[in-house]
Amino acid sequence: MGKVIGIDLGTTNSCVAVLEGGEPVVIPNSEGNRTTPSVVAFGKDGERIVGEPAKRQAVVNPEKTIISIKTHMGSDHKVAIDDKNYTPEDISAMILQKIKADAEAYLGEAVTDAVITVPAYFTDSQRQATKDAGKIAGLNVRRIINEPTAASLAYGLDKTDEHQKILVYDLGGGTFDVSILELGDGVFEVLATNGNNNLGGDDFDQALMDYIAEAFKKQEGIDLRKDKMSLQRLKEASEKAKQELSSTMTSSINLPFITATNEGPKHLNMDITRSKFDEITSHLVEKTMGPMRSALKDAGLSASDINKIILVGGSTRIPAVQQAVKKITNQDPHKGVNPDECVAVGAAIQAGVLTGEVKDVLLLDVTPLSLGIETLGGVFTRLIERNTTIPSKKSQTFSTAADNQPAVDIHVLQGEREMAAGNVSLGRFELSGIPPAHRGIPQIEVTFDIDANGIVNVSAKDLGTGKEQKITITASTKLSDEEIEKKIKEAEEHAEEDKMQKEKIEVRNQADSLVYQIEKTLKESEGKIDKEEEGKVTAELEKLKKAVESDIVEDMKKAIEDVNTVFHAISQKLYEQAAQAQEAEGQEQAGDDNIVDAEYEEVKDEETQGEDEK
């Protein structure tokens, strides 16, 4: 069996590693570098250029150069090049093909299998898209693993006998994740995860780029962002300045001939201090603090419980980021892992776990958001709670909401709001062919199954007929830039409102069910119930129906209580009547048994008498 490689498919840069002699080794690319820019370009003749060469030619070919495609994974985004549309999966596959070829050149053998990392907060469709990109690139993706979890493997492989809690802060080029893990006895267990799929180093570049562009516009009256070539030069200069400011206090930006007017060429010369950069990007650093606090809260830990802080991603080299993390955790981050390479190293270790090369290591990851379905009244019914360890399988039985309902619509959702409308729709499917029956009678078993890749499969089965429908969620989540990050925050802000609305729907459903059951019982027990008592129940039922129309929770609750009180006496009498009928039937059967015994004894006597006569 060939080697299984570990790939960190990043927004800005990608990296690949493999286990050699039980130790993870980062594979250099064909240019001799340990990371590869996640950039794809198309030359004049349609030639495909990937990695460092693509990044180098971006200034002269901005329209046919694609960067940060990872931010569009799982969406219907298209890149139009030379009258052809490319999906994010297509572009990502080109990067993966380059990585695959470099790995094959290094190993001297064909590579067919890989473990690929994704941000912990990637949705189901984004994970599926990553797996599809691997398939397009000719790779059998053995496992999708979360980036912070991979980083923890890189950190803790030689510390499996130690018991500690670690916080992984992963700020990449386009995504941000934070995960809390517990490490001990070879088990890497994720306790909680949080993040933002649309926050990363690119946003820091953009903030600095906008500041420089506005300053130039104020001075020269020209907006450099309107010219694609000037914009690309400005972007590269901003990225370089950001990197320099991690180790120096000032960075000089010099872009001669950045643009031209009738008066002649214009040059851009500007000094950026670290304090100015920190001021420009302070809101971005602060955006990472919320998910960090939420992850600690979800894990049931305080900052003092954390033993080690692991920083992952090139953007964590920014001093302001390190200071912000230290401010919350009251400790310096661990410097023992390479933030650019540790995710790929962790992926290679996971590959070794899958092949059996690495033993006594167990990885327990979690799902970042709750999963469930929409039920009567638009309520979101959770089947799998957020931060549940995966793989996980959970079933729950539901029923029909109307008499003779021939089909049920299963609407699959992801999020933290109590009402379905406040969550993300992942997809829907229909289970049809349900035999005619009163509502509440059919038993529909809905099963959610999340595999180790975090990909969701949902099935619905009619337990009466055995009919079943399944769906693998592949639909785009269609989320705007900050929707996923806002899910839990929105849930907290709207918790009371959602709780009241959910209670109202549940009480209304309870009332409807009670009316249905009692009216059914009255009809089936006609002639067995005292007319006066039946009249009392009917009157209370009418009051309950009016209370439901009023939509006031307290009125509905009181009406339900009143109906139950009046109906209790009738149900008691019906129970006693049924018990008496059963007792009478039992006595009748006992009488029949006695007659049979008597006949048997008489026959025996006759035979005995006959023998005596002989």
Curated annotation (Swiss-Prot):
The protein's GO terms of the molecular function aspect are: ATP binding; ATP-dependent protein folding chaperone; unfolded protein binding
PROSITE patterns recorded:
HSP70_1, HSP70_2, HSP70_3
Instruction: Quote the biased-composition stretches of kind Low complexity, using this chain's numbering.
Output: 579-589
**Which residues does this entry mark as bearing Phosphothreonine?**
175
KW Amino-acid biosynthesis (keyword) present: no
The parts of the chain that form a coiled coil are: none
Induction of its expression: By stress conditions e.g. heat shock.
Stretch list, region Disordered:
579-614
| Cited Pfam families | HSP70
InterPro entries cross-referenced by the UniProt entry: ATPase_NBD, Chaperone_DnaK, Heat_shock_70_CS, HSP70_C_sf, HSP70_peptide-bd_sf, Hsp_70_fam
Q: So which domain of life are we looking at?
A: Bacteria
The UniProt regions of compositional bias labelled Acidic residues, in chain numbering, are 590-614
Assigned keywords, A-Z: ATP-binding, Chaperone, Nucleotide-binding, Phosphoprotein, Stress response
Instruction: Give the matching SUPFAM superfamilies.
Output: Actin-like ATPase domain, Heat shock protein 70kD (HSP70), C-terminal subdomain, Heat shock protein 70kD (HSP70), peptide-binding domain
Q: Report the sequence similarity comment from the record.
A: Belongs to the heat shock protein 70 family.
* Reported function: Acts as a chaperone.
Name of the featured protein: Chaperone protein DnaK
Query: Which species is listed as the source?
Result: Alkaliphilus metalliredigens (strain QYMF)
Task: Name the gene for this chain.
Answer: dnaK
